[in-house]
Amino acid sequence: LKYEFENIFPGCRLLDIHEYLFEKGLTLPDKGQKYLYHEPCHTPMKQYSSIKVAETLLSAEVKMSDRCCGEAGTFSVSRPDIAAQVRYRKEHELKSNLLEFDETPAKILTSCPACQQGLSRYESATALETDYIVVEMVKQHLGDEWSKAFTHQVLNGGMENILL
């Protein structure tokens, strides 16, 4: 399957939200936090290095955590026998990654919903919470209750009141 966006939308680029924010120069203040980054097997970031994007947006040290998380859409359901072995290797990779830090990183971040679900399976073994880069940025900027406030605004004032 080949995407032909250039034929449908001439002159337009397809960018992941993280790359868009990176190009716009958006960054958080440096809080001395450290993160692991799990790059999805089918990463949405195509224009820039995902580590460079994450480090720049978060103003933080970000280290890559290799290996598939074992979720891969329907893979974990269709082939649980193989997925279990992939998850076993990923768990060992995460534990190895943690040894590279002086202190436990704040979280493991990703840019894929299936990977976020897969990575959440390791929280009890690693004490690492999983999130999207952009959600981590919003939480740091607006606080942990941002989602409730956003939902309240949408339900009571419409999207245009939030955007404008």
Language-model segments: residues:
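Iron-sulfur cluster-binding electron-transfer modules in prokaryotic oxidoreductases
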Residues: 1-164
